[in-house]
């Protein structure tokens, strides 16, 4: 017997609510630093820190419109809406009735993950729906006994590598799960091996780029681990609770139990364990398990369907309200610094103050007597992206990540307006004088707040050597 019918009307209502809410709030506090960075990157087959898909989307959309971030965020909104639908379809594959599908869709619509990564265009926005699609296809292959769905899963995973190579961790988790808890015969299936081959074939340009550029993703991963591991390893356990919201933890834990009790899909529990272990060992970012938790949540809703009533409806509503306040620009920008929101949601923190910062940096640049041999060099890509977006008349460079390779100041440059935390290094390379301190004016303590703006002259090394000294990955 096949799965229950798709309850499209009951699933699409919460999907539409999420899409409308995200669209209404899309301009919000302004661009996130990563959005500004992606928009500044010129199209390429890959970058030291990213595959090409999300930067290509951001650059293309940003070039169509020079106003706020709403257009840039349309793909993120679509990904969040897609995540709601896909998670409901996962519940259906697991035997969920129309009621279970509706509860799953409404539940996913209330999560911090869907609202945070649906509000800002990041690689995580795409991964949230891409990982769900891979898992949905694998479930269809196993539960419907239609192995051709393995090929679809492989194709989706191959496309997902253009967004982030992290999807390979999901595939590794599936392989480990099949090997450890079965069904082991799948490891001998030509459909599974065909899926693996299709992933490699579709993602081949990514492989070629990595091999011909000295495996930059490994270098980037090591840099992130060195910089972040001390914070990521303790915080990832907190993130497991807040990713979908504290009220939903009970449901996704019940989902893991339900998946474990079904021999056909028990391997998915191992997938979750592998992703959690990878997150801990790599220490790069805390949010990676978020991409597989929706599957466990859907399984939990199906398992707990008869217990879901008015009390759980209230809990879902509370979860949605708290998630919205955390994830979306509902608190006025002038007041948000006095709330916990910037501390809980770093994306909100990283979206506040860019116009003020650009004005302050621009004032230092405009005050220079000679612009012909002057540039702005920023310590991070957010500052560079903001200037490129809001002051296109200023020549701006950064030696962080992919911007290091994209361009460096001309050899004849004699004066630099240097912005941010690299001033100590710059003092050994130039004669520098601090002329301002960045201030967003709303008391939000983000990465830029209080950072110096310095005028640096008389470079002591040729620019190729200076640029190498300023280069950093993080």
Question: What is each stretch, according to the model?
Answer:
Residues 170-261:
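Transmembrane-lumen/periplasm boundary regions of multi-pass, lipid-linked membrane glycan transferases
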Residues 74-95, 133:
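Transmembrane-helix motifs of polytopic, lipid-linked glycan transferases
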Residues 119-126:
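Short acidic/glycine- and proline-prone juxtamembrane loop motifs at membrane-interface regions
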Residues 23-38, 47-61, 66-70, 214:
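Extracytoplasmic catalytic/substrate-binding loops of multi-pass membrane glycan-assembly enzymes
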Residues 312-373, 382-385, 389-393, 399-401, ...:
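Membrane-proximal, lumen/periplasm-facing interface regions of secretory-pathway glyco-
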Residues 134-149, 254-261:
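Membrane-interface transmembrane helices that cradle and orient dolichyl/undecaprenyl
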Residues 8-10, 87-110:
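Transmembrane-helix signature of polytopic, membrane-embedded enzymes
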Residues 15, 104-109, 157, 161, ...:
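Short helix- or helix-capping micro-motifs
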């Amino acid at each position: 017997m096949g799965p229950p019918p798709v309850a499209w009307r009951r699933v699409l209502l919460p999907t539409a609510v999420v899409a409308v809410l995200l669209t209404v709030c899309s301009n919000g506090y302004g661009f996130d630093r990563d959005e500004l960075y992606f928009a500044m990157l010129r199209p390429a087959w890959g970058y030291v820190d990213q595959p090409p898909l999300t930067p290509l989307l951001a650059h293309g959309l940003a070039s169509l419109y020079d106003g706020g971030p709403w257009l840039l965020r349309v793909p993120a909104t679509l990904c969040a809406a897609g995540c709601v639908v896909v998670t409901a379809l996962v519940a259906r594959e697991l035997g969920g009735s129309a009621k279970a599908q509706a509860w799953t869709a409404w539940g996913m619509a209330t999560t911090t993950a869907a609202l945070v990564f649906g509000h800002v265009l990041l690689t995580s926005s795409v991964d949230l729906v891409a990982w769900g699609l891979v898992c949905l296809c694998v479930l269809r292959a196993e539960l419907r006994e239609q192995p051709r769905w393995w090929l679809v899963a492989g194709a989706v995973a191959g496309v997902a590598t253009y967004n982030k190579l992290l999807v390979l961790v999901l595939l590794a988790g599936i392989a480990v799960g099949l090997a450890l808890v079965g069904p082991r015969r799948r490891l001998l299936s030509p459909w599974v091996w065909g899926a693996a081959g299709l992933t490699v074939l579709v993602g081949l340009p990514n492989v070629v780029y990595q091999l011909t550029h000295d495996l930059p993703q490994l270098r980037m991963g090591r840099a992130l681990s060195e910089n972040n591991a001390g914070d990521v390893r303790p915080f990832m356990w907190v993130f497991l609770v807040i990713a979908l919201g504290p009220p939903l933890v009970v449901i996704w834990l019940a989902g893991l139990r339900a998946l474990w009790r079904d021999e056909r899909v028990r391997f998915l529990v191992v997938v979750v364990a592998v992703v959690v272990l990878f997150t801990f060992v790599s220490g790069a970012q805390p949010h990676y398990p978020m991409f597989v938790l929706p599957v466990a949540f859907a399984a939990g809703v199906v398992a707990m369907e008869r217990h879901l009533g008015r009390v759980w409806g209230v809990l879902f509503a509370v979860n949605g309200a708290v998630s919205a306040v955390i994830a979306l620009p509902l608190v006025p920008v002038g007041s948000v610094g006095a709330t916990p929101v910037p501390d809980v949601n770093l994306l909100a923190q990283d979206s506040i103050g860019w116009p003020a910062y650009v004005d302050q940096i621009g004032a230092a640049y405009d005050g220079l007597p000679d612009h012909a041999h002057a540039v702005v060099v920023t310590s991070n890509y957010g500052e560079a992206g903001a200037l490129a977006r809001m002051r296109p008349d200023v020549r701006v460079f950064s030696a962080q990540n992919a911007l290091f390779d994209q361009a460096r100041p001309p050899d004849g440059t004699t004066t630099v307006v240097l912005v941010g935390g690299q001033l100590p290094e710059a003092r050994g390379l130039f004669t520098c004088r601090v002329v301002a301190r960045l201030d967003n004016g709303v008391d939000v303590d983000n990465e830029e707040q209080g950072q110096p703006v310095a005028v640096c002259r008389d470079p002591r090394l040729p620019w190729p050597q200076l640029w190498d000294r300023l280069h950093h990955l993080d």
